[in-house]
Amino acid sequence: MTMMDMNFKYCHKIMKKHSKSFSYAFDLLPEDQRKAVWAIYAVCRKIDDSIDVYGDIQFLNQIKEDIQSIEKYPYEHHHFQSDRRIMMALQHVAQHKNIAFQSFYNLIDTVYKDQHFTMFETDAELFGYCYGVAGTVGEVLTPILSDHETHQTYDVARRLGESLQLINILRDVGEDFDNERVYFSKQRLKQYEVDIAEVYQNGVNNHYIDLWEYYAAIAEKDFQDVMDQIKVFSIEAQPIIELAARIYIEILDEVRQANYTLHERVFVDKRKKAKLFHEINSKYHRI
């Protein structure tokens, strides 16, 4: 195993640890594509964790400077400051793919702002956040998952990322509240007459369910729009993207089956993932 292979293996471990659903799906890509996904996921995870886990703004600055070095001089030797193994893997990817570096910087800017979280006044602000933390990831992955990236390809990948982030929010309402965060907008909370603190303390009510389903309908519509345009991605990537997205959309039904609880994180079990895999395998005949 070469040193570069070890770098990619390190990135893969990060992805498997933090997102079993993504790993389950994207590990089915051809080798070069899945390695690129591992590297990009690992970079994005380190960006996310720089503040939430490490509480280290300097580490986030180092990540940004390392990415800038790769963008400017992709073939030069660099003394990376953040995580050398991840950055070497990203540099290798950047030498072969047209990486949308600005999307990395947009993600970093969102993480900077998230240090001083305040509730969103409107849904527009919420959806802007979903772009910043997840739509950006879709943009960065676009050259890996398509043969000829176009404006439409970037748009579809961006919308998929935003949809998956909204699903994350719908899954983690209680966990986020424990961390003193409510991502639903004040505008929509007022419209549906919902106080998350009250729901957390006293249990789910019809007002909360209606609010939750309002946002779930948006995520489901975006998911369907992506599925309707999935042919913008490469033949190899189409079944993988559909598998990842369908595993994620299944989370919404898991929340429903758990009676919208705020006190337990739901997940899609291995049996259901395997069922989805076989359905999509039959559809595409080539996973």
Swiss-Prot record:
Pathway: Carotenoid biosynthesis; staphyloxanthin biosynthesis; staphyloxanthin from farnesyl diphosphate: step 1/5. Mg(2+) 2 binds at residues 168, 172. The keyword Nuclease does not apply. Its cofactor is Mg(2+). The keyword Magnesium applies. One of its GO terms (biological process) is carotenoid biosynthetic process. Keywords: Carotenoid biosynthesis, Magnesium, Metal-binding, Transferase, Virulence. Binds 2 Mg(2+) ions per subunit. It catalyses: 2 (2E,6E)-farnesyl diphosphate = 15-cis-4,4'-diapophytoene + 2 diphosphate. Gene3D superfamilies: Farnesyl Diphosphate Synthase (1.10.600.10). (2E,6E)-farnesyl diphosphate 1 binds at residues 18-21, 41, 45, 171, 248. Its EC number is 2.5.1.96. It comes from the Bacteria. (2E,6E)-farnesyl diphosphate 2 binds at residues 45, 165. Mg(2+) 1 binds at residues 48, 52. GO terms for molecular function: geranylgeranyl diphosphate synthase activity; metal ion binding; squalene synthase [NAD(P)H] activity. InterPro entries: Isoprenoid_synthase_dom_sf, Squ/phyt_synthse, Squalene/phytoene_synthase_CS, Trans_IPPS_bact-type, Trans_IPPS_HH. Involved in the biosynthesis of the yellow-orange carotenoid staphyloxanthin, which plays a role in the virulence via its protective function against oxidative stress. Catalyzes the head-to-head condensation of two molecules of farnesyl diphosphate (FPP) into the colorless C(30) carotenoid 4,4'-diapophytoene (dehydrosqualene). Belongs to the phytoene/squalene synthase family. CrtM subfamily. This is 4,4'-diapophytoene synthase. It comes from Staphylococcus aureus (strain N315).
